[in-house]
Amino acid sequence: MARLKEIYRKEIAPKLKEELKLGNVMEVPRVTKITLNMGLGEAIGDKKVIENAVADLEKITGQKVVVTYARKSIAGFKVREGWPIGVKVTLRRDRMYEFLDRLLSISLPRVRDFRGLNAKSFDGRGNYSMGVKEQIIFPEIDYDKIDALRGLDITLTTTAKNDDEGRALLRAFKFPFRN
């Protein structure tokens, strides 16, 4: 079992149950999935970009990546319907907890000029989204073998009913929030 999953079950869930005054352990908010998305506008001109992004994201997550395609043609962006424009991966269960553990303990401390995560990046339903400017903060990526620095979006989907519950959950996981 993943280290963070064990900590959640034994320490975080009982503490949150008391803190949020919930009657049942099943009511306690938990992280259900983590979605990583990499939008690749530059892939329009070069198909190699998609292959490199897929390889990077697969190294980071240890899971097969899905290529996303344009749903509509947009002349302003020079995009045609059906062209590959990004990659994404959804992590659940043990892989999700292992990724979250690596993100909090290894990757975020490697961010240059890191001052903490924005505590206002919740969506109103307890889900949290954050952006990473460079994929090289992950130890799985070899700096010498990357072709370009690419950012990615990380979304944590929780069972929290509102932002306050979601914030309490992520604070219990020791997320380094700014304010």
Swiss-Prot record:
Q: Which superkingdom heads the taxonomic lineage of this protein's source?
A: Bacteria
Describe its assembly: Part of the 50S ribosomal subunit; part of the 5S rRNA/L5/L18/L25 subcomplex. Contacts the 5S rRNA and the P site tRNA. Forms a bridge to the 30S subunit in the 70S ribosome.
Q: Does the keyword Ribosomal protein apply?
A: yes
Q: Which family does it belong to?
A: Belongs to the universal ribosomal protein uL5 family.
Q: One GO MF term, please?
A: rRNA binding
Query: Gene name on record?
Result: rplE
Q: What is the organism of origin for this protein?
A: Pseudomonas syringae pv. tomato (strain ATCC BAA-871 / DC3000)
N-terminal signal peptide: none
Keyword annotations for this protein, in alphabetical order, are: Ribonucleoprotein, Ribosomal protein, RNA-binding, rRNA-binding, tRNA-binding
One Pfam match: Ribosomal_L5
A GO-annotated cellular component: ribonucleoprotein complex
Example GO BP: translation
Role description: This is one of the proteins that bind and probably mediate the attachment of the 5S RNA into the large ribosomal subunit, where it forms part of the central protuberance. In the 70S ribosome it contacts protein S13 of the 30S subunit (bridge B1b), connecting the 2 subunits; this bridge is implicated in subunit movement. Contacts the P site tRNA; the 5S rRNA and some of its associated proteins might help stabilize positioning of ribosome-bound tRNAs.
- InterPro entries found in the cross-reference section: Ribosomal_uL5 (IPR002132), Ribosomal_uL5_bac-type (IPR020930), Ribosomal_uL5_C (IPR031309), Ribosomal_uL5_CS (IPR020929), Ribosomal_uL5_dom_sf (IPR022803), Ribosomal_uL5_N (IPR031310)
Which SUPFAM superfamilies did the record assign? RL5-like
* PROSITE patterns per record: RIBOSOMAL_L5
Q: Which HAMAP family match?
A: Ribosomal_uL5_B
**Annotated protein name in UniProt:** Large ribosomal subunit protein uL5
Q: Coiled-coil stretches, from where to where?
A: none
